[in-house]
């Protein structure tokens, strides 16, 4: 049975990757269908009710700069906002928001329902239809066939998902949802390498049974940050506190006593878990010298009593979970409303993807999110946007696009995955980026919004706001560079009390701002120097561009050198055995990874600069030198 309409792009899955993919393709004008097993869970936050953080907040800002939904939904759902690393340099500052699960889901669903060119249909997908190495559609569990030119698969943890609590386990995509068994079996038939990963979640606690007076209160920031470049503090709902407590030796003894019934330590779970978000049993085992671990007590929303105890993800049996929770200060009488669990699921080796997130072996089939071995809403959303965008570009007969490592954290994410692959759930950190001084949260729109407009991702309202901001920044920078103060100026007596060293020679306003004791707002409040910019984001941009101009220029020069051969393309059908001078080890690695560019090849472990030189000579001799998009 065939559906009565044909689509340009079909997106399978309605999580963070799927929603961004569907919205991106539809914004670009492609007739798009989003298929989900349950309309009510579109935009569901399956684990931690929070968005952003170190590295992750950078991805959210980039999604937003390209017109995505995650940051906007967070502004409407965020019940506590904080800027992490606020005392450090701008490169590592990151916005994090605690979110109300219900409000976040509602906002995402509202955005989806009002998006032109997008249809939503409730059915689980059981089959991917491939003809002559090209995807042509999907078939749902009731046998309904949908045709499309491109398919974006965002199956999350649902592929052959298995939930573990103690030594008991059962099939599931997440708690309360069925797994995708038939689709997982079908995908294993495709020529793409497959593995198993594991992730977990903590038990949820009834807030009415917690003694918060025994814990440390953690309030949000004042003034309140916003997540979206289009956001405003007026969008935020009521703001509330989180709380901090700790495990103790009694907690650790309870956990050690239950390890014989842990699915992780009894060999029941085969999948590898996330290194940077370990279970509490993993923490006790790996950091046996520590007598306590911090736990963040995070409300799940304004209209629920459920609490997310961030830091005690576990798959131990329920009785052990209850005992360990009640051993923690402030939770002596706590009641669990949902048990913690681990989930194992299939993922596919991202080295089998192009940097457009299209599979190398099946034309028109794109993968995004946890199916590629990542962990986290933000990583999923970034991949979804990129995959949906490239699916739309392909349908339109246009070249694929992916930002380079020096252009966006999205570029770092995709390059790491498609070049190096991953054997454990991949999480973004600022430390993964070589050029993080240029890849800041604050300039994500300056880096990406113009490209997003060119691609058709950015609407008129965002473009108008961005253009106005850019113009105000440029005009203010020109003003600071062109206005000067002389030692005999009547402004000097007003200015000198604010300076460590008094004015002794002619100086521009820009030079004054560059002084370490001066900041933009302080300078603008001094008589004769203001009023300055009213927009705090534009003002912040002016300050950073002035104060860090030397560092930024040096990093840009490094990038210009590195980019010279970065985008030199390598044919996917190139047999490296035919390249004279390469060692057997290098040949094996290049034939296994099939890098798309010289830049990707250079980042594969064991590929030497000499091997790269040999490749460049070979390409030149064969007339194969080309630049990728």
Swiss-Prot record:
Intracellular or extracellular location(s): Cytoplasm
InterPro entries: FAD/NAD-bd_sf, GIDA_C_N, MnmG, MnmG-rel, MnmG-rel_CS, MnmG_C, MnmG_C_subdom, MnmG_C_subdom_sf
Co-factor requirement: FAD
GO molecular function: flavin adenine dinucleotide binding
GO BP, one annotated term: tRNA wobble uridine modification
Keyword terms: Cytoplasm, FAD, Flavoprotein, NAD, tRNA processing
Gene Ontology cellular component annotations, sorted alphabetically: cytosol
Keyword set includes Chloroplast: no
Entry keyword Lipid metabolism: no
Gene3D superfamilies xrefs: FAD/NAD(P)-binding domain, GidA associated domain, C-terminal subdomain, tRNA uridine 5-carboxymethylaminomethyl modification enzyme MnmG/GidA
Top-level division of the source organism's lineage: Bacteria
Binding site for FAD: 13-18, 125, 180, 370
Residues reported in the UniProt entry to bind NAD(+): 273-287
Function in brief: NAD-binding protein involved in the addition of a carboxymethylaminomethyl (cmnm) group at the wobble position (U34) of certain tRNAs, forming tRNA-cmnm(5)s(2)U34.
UniProt cross-references to NCBIfam families, sorted A to Z: mnmG_gidA (TIGR00136)
Record's subunit section: Homodimer. Heterotetramer of two MnmE and two MnmG subunits.
Family designation: Belongs to the MnmG family.
Name of this protein: tRNA uridine 5-carboxymethylaminomethyl modification enzyme MnmG
């Amino acid at each position: 049975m065939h559906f009565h309409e044909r689509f340009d792009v079909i997106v399978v899955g309605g999580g963070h990757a799927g929603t961004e993919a569907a919205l991106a393709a539809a914004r670009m004008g492609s007739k798009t269908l989003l298929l989900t097993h349950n309309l009510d869970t579109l935009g569901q936050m399956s684990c931690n009710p929070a968005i952003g953080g170190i590295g992750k907040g950078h991805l959210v800002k980039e999604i937003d700069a390209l017109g995505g939904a995650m940051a906007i939904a967070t502004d409407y759902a965020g019940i506590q906002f904080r800027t992490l690393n606020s005392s450090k340099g701008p490169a590592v500052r990151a916005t994090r928001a605690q979110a109300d699960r219900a409000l976040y889901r509602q906002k995402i669903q509202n955005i989806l329902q009002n998006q032109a060119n997008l249809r939503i249909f409730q059915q689980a997908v059981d089959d991917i239809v491939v003809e002559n190495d090209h995807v042509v559609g999907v078939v749902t569990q009731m046998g309904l066939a949908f045709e499309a030119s491109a398919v974006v698969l965002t199956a999350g943890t649902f592929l052959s998902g298995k939930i573990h609590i103690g030594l008991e386990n059962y099939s599931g995509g997440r708690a309360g949802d069925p797994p995708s068994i038939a689709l997982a079996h079908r995908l294993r038939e495709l020529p793409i390498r497959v593995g198993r990963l594991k992730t977990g979640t903590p038990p949820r606690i009834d807030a009415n049974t917690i003694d918060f007076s025994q814990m440390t209160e953690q309030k949000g920031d004042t003034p309140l940050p916003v997540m979206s470049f289009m956001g405003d503090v007026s969008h935020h709902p009521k703001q509330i506190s989180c709380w901090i407590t700790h495990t103790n030796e009694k907690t650790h003894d309870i956990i050690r006593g239950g390890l014989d019934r842990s699915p992780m330590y009894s060999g029941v779970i085969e999948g590898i878990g996330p290194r940077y978000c370990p279970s509490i049993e993993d923490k006790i085992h790996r950091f046996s010298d520590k007598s306590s671990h911090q736990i963040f007590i995070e409300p799940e929303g304004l209209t629920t009593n459920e609490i997310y105890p961030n830091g005690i993800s576990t798959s131990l049996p329920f009785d052990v979970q209850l005992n360990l929770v009640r051993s923690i200060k402030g939770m002596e009488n706590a009641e669990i409303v949902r048990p913690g669990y681990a989930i194992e699921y299939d993922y596919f080796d991202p080295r089998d993807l192009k940097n457009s997130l299209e599979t190398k072996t099946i034309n028109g089939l794109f993968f995004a999110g946890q199916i590629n071995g990542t962990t986290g809403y933000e990583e999923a959303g970034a991949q979804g946007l990129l995959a949906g965008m490239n699916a739309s570009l392909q349908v339109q007969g246009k070249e694929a696009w992916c930002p380079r490592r020096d252009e966006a954290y999205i570029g770092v994410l995709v390059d790491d995955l498609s070049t190096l692959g991953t054997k454990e759930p991949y999480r973004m950190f600022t430390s993964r980026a070589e050029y993080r001084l240029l890849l800041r949260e604050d300039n994500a729109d300056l880096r990406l919004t113009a490209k997003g407009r060119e691609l058709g991702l950015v609407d008129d309202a965002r473009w108008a706001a961005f253009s106005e901001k850019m113009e105000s920044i440029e005009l203010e920078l020109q003003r600071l560079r062109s206005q000067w103060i002389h030692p005999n100026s009547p402004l000097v007596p007003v200015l000198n009390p604010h300076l460590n060293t008094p004015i002794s020679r002619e100086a521009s306003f820009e030079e004054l701002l560059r002084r370490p004791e001066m900041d933009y707002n302080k300078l603008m409040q001094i008589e004769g120097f203001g009023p300055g910019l009213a927009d705090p984001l534009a003002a912040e941009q002016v300050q950073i561009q002035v104060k860090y101009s030397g560092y930024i220029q040096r990093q840009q020069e490094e990038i210009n050198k590195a980019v010279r051969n970065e985008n030199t393309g390598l044919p996917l059908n190139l047999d490296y055995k035919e390249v004279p001078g390469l060692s057997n080890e290098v040949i094996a690695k290049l034939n296994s990874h099939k890098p798309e560019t010289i830049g990707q090849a250079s980042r594969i472990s064991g590929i030497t600069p000499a091997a790269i030189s040999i490749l460049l000579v070979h390409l030149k001799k064969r007339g194969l030198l080309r630049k990728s998009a």
